[in-house]
Each structure stands twice: as C-alpha cells, then as structure tokens.
UniProtKB/Swiss-Prot annotation:
It comes from Stutzerimonas stutzeri. This is Ion-translocating oxidoreductase complex subunit G. It holds the Pfam family FMN_bind. It is an enzyme of class 7 (translocase). The chain crosses the membrane at residues 35-55.
Length: 228
C-alpha cells in the first residue's frame, strides 16, 4: 500500500504579509528601530540648537561689552582710573530717572570719575548715551551708544560724523545756568539740527539728567558724612 505523503502548502504571494512566519517580529523590530532613530535625531538636533543659541548669545554679549568698552574709553581718560569700570558697574534706581547704570572710575582706590548710561526718548525711539563726569561734576565726555534716529537728519549725535556732541565737554551745573541746558530754539545754548530738533533735545535732556543725578548723590553723601 502506498502511503500518501502531504507536502506543506507553498505561499503563493496572496497571503496577508503579517501572517507569514517571522514577519510580525521583523516589523516590530523595524518600528522600534525607526522610533529610536527618530528620537536620537531629535535629541541631536535639540542639543545642536541649544549649543548654537548659547554660542550666539555669548557672541552678542561679548560684542555689547566691546561696544561699551570702546565708548567708555572715549569719555573716561585712562589716566583717571586703574580699575575696570565695566566689571565694577552697578545699577541705581532713581526716583526721577528710573534705572541707571553706573560705571565708577577709581585710581588707587579713590573715585575719580563716573560714567552714567542713561536712556532718553528721541524721535525714532530710545537714545542710549554715556555721560562721564569727574568728581567735581564737570563733563568729561558724552557719547551715544545706540539710537534709532532718522539717518541723515540726526547723524550729528554720532562723534564719527560731527563734533556737535563735544560741545558738552568741560561744562557743569556750576558753569552753565539751568535755563541754558536746552537747544537754541528753546532758549538754550546748544545747536539744534535742521529737521531734527527732537534728537538734540533728547541728548541735552540726558546730559542734564546725569548732572542732576550726580548732584543729588553728592548732596546725599555729604549729608550722611555731616550727621553726628
């Protein structure tokens, strides 16, 4: 008697793919691998973005520091200090001016001059300026750190384009009457610009504020020293 032998059915390609032996496991492994790869790529991208932001932020901070240092060197004579005014800077909250950045210049431990960073409102927005005063309240120099004034009309506030801002050098509250701290159009002694009166007004206002702030600080210190 011949025994009948049965051969296993051969897949004809019409079976559902997930019913084939081993394909389910292979599919699961692929999905897990792809998910892991995607997660790894996302993590690497996040790290790269974070490092890039940190490097960019540091470059911006360094550039701002260099800008401040360059301006400070223009208004504070090197002979007046042996400290680092940038490193020794501090903020003061003033009732009239708000927050003021103060950069003290010292030589042999003694305060010889002070630079103030003050912001006033011009025609195009804030005008940030440095005003340096010696210990007697005389102006050592005034420079604009940043502004958004109209190009061409307000260029004179930049020392690289005009000597207008040097007109403040050597002045003080003691040497210049209060009513003269204005542009000529307003009865003061400082030139205005053709078509841009608001800009020089803002500069003069900032300088006067710095002078008055130092005067208030000096008066307060003197009162403390004379108290029993």
């Amino acid at each position: 008697m011949n025994e009948l032998t049965q051969t296993p059915p051969v897949a004809d390609g019409n079976e559902p793919p997930f019913t084939r032996p081993g394909l389910v496991e292979t599919w699961r492994e692929r999905v897990s691998y792809q998910a892991l790869s995607l997660g790894l790529v996302c993590a690497l991208v996040a790290v790269a973005l974070l490092l890039g932001n940190q490097l960019t932020h540091q470059r911006i901070v360094d550039a701002e520091r260099q800008d401040r240092l360059a301006v400070l060197r223009q208004v504070l004579p090197q002979a007046l200090y042996d400290n680092d005014p940038l490193a020794d800077a501090f903020n003061v909250e003033d009732a009239e001016l708000g927050l003021i950045e103060v950069y003290p210049a010292r030589r042999a431990g003694q305060l010889t001059a002070t630079a103030f960073q003050i912001s006033t409102v011009g025609y195009g927005g804030p005008i940030v300026q440095f005003i340096a005063l010696d210990s007697e309240g005389r102006i050592l120099g005034v420079r604009v750190l940043s502004h958004k004034e109209t190009p061409g009309l307000a260029d004179k506030i930049e020392v690289t384009r005009s000597d207008w801002i040097k007109a403040f050098d050597g002045l003080s509250l003691a040497s210049t009457p209060l009513d003269q701290w204005a542009v000529k159009k307003d009865g003061g002694q400082f030139d205005q610009f053709a078509g841009a009166t608001i800009t020089p007004r803002a500069i003069v206002k900032g300088v006067l504020r710095a002078l008055e702030f130092q005067a208030r600080q000096s008066t307060a210190q003197s009162n403390q020293e004379t108290r029993p």
